[in-house]
């Protein structure tokens, strides 16, 4: 029988499951090296935590790791139902809030090691969290793909910690009651990108699709299709970072100016950026709330103990 200690939270409605203990040892390498070990040798632990019957498609896991550097508060490896994530904005906010709950950190600035580099997270006195992300940049502008049933769709390819295709002119209604249609449209766009061979840098697959719309109260409202078939309930930290990179490249948002990004369900992140060589360094601010603390149990004779493959 296996036991995995977890603490759940949600950031703007998007859940994060922090794995505190119970995973196999991954060695003392970087977070990228440990991710490779986890994916290659112990992927069933990811599946057990995230897939049904213990998880769901919308859940993001965050394996809490000892950092390489003594100056870092923690290391983390993010994963979901489809595999592994280089970085996760909402997940980092959830992780920092969880570390505070565990008594590991107090308000202040903390460095978090991720597989794509270190991020700086500030826990504020009101327990909201600001995340200074990795470098974000636009890789390609005005990329056109033919989407069956929808015709030509134009968008930008950008990196914000994950690869995104960002579309503003899509003709879809970005609203909570329309998520089924939005997911179908975004899935069709992602499939069209794959057929056309459109990728991120060095052939990296584009696994996130982000649709933007005007919002009467905030700067924008977005729908984000994550890897697999789930959509982001939060405004998506890495997606907002990619959006800032595109706005900066187009001269539509100056450094230091706040951009307020709403999600499809109405939760909000505040974001700004600092100019940097080759792109921008975004800072995303949001809040997470604790929702559960539990021990997952995997019985030896459970036929679905290691998850139900979808």
From Swiss-Prot:
Membrane in keyword set: no
Keywords: Isomerase
Catalytic machinery residues: 88 (proton acceptor), 236 (proton donor)
Domain of life: Bacteria
Cysteines paired by S-S bonds: none
Catalytic activity: trans-4-hydroxy-L-proline = cis-4-hydroxy-D-proline
Activity control summary: Inhibited by iodoacetate, iodoacetamide and by high amounts (10 mM) of pyrrole-2-carboxylic acid (PYC). Not inhibited by PYC at 1 mM.
Binding site for substrate: 89-90, 208, 232, 237-238
MF terms in GO: 4-hydroxyproline epimerase activity
UniProt family annotation: Belongs to the proline racemase family.
Role, per record: Allows intracellular utilization of 4-hydroxyproline, one of the major constituents of host collagen, by converting 4-hydroxy-L-proline to 4-hydroxy-D-proline, which can be further metabolized by intracellular 4-hydroxy-D-proline oxidases.
Quaternary structure note: Homodimer.
Name of the featured protein: 4-hydroxyproline epimerase
Native organism: Burkholderia pseudomallei (strain K96243)
């Amino acid at each position: 029988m296996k036991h995995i200690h977890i603490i759940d939270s949600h950031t703007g409605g998007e859940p994060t499951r922090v794995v505190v203990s119970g995973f196999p040892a991954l060695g003392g390498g970087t977070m990228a090296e440990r991710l490779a070990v986890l994916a290659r040798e112990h992927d069933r632990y990811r599946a057990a935590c995230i897939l049904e019957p213990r998880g769901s498609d919308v859940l993001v896991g965050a394996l809490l790791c000892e950092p390489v550097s003594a100056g870092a508060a923690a290391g983390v490896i993010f994963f979901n139902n489809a595999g592994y994530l280089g970085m996760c904005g909402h997940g980092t906010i959830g992780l920092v809030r969880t570390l505070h709950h565990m008594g590991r950190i107090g308000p202040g600035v903390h460095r978090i090691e991720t597989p794509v580099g270190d991020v700086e997270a500030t826990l504020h006195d009101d327990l909201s969290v600001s995340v200074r992300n990795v470098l974000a940049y636009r890789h390609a502008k005005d990329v056109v793909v033919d989407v069956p049933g929808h015709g030509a769709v134009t968008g930008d390819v950008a990196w914000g910690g994950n690869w995104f295709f960002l579309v503003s002119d899509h003709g879809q209604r970005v609203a909570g009651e329309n998520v089924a249609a939005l997911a179908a449209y975004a899935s069709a766009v992602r499939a069209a990108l794959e057929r056309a061979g459109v990728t991120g840098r060095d052939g990296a697959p584009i696994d996130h699709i982000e649709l933007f719309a005007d919002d009467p109260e905030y700067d924008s409202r977005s729908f984000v299709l994550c890897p697999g078939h789930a959509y982001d309930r939060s405004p998506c930290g890495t997606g907002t970072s990619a959006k800032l990179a595109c706005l900066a490249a187009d001269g539509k948002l100056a450094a230091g100016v706040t951009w307020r990004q709403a999600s499809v369900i109405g939760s909000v992140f505040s974001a700004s950026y600092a100019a940097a060589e080759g792109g921008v360094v975004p800072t995303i601010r949001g809040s997470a709330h604790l929702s559960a603390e539990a021990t997952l149990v995997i019985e030896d004779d459970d036929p679905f103990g290691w998850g139900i493959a979808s």
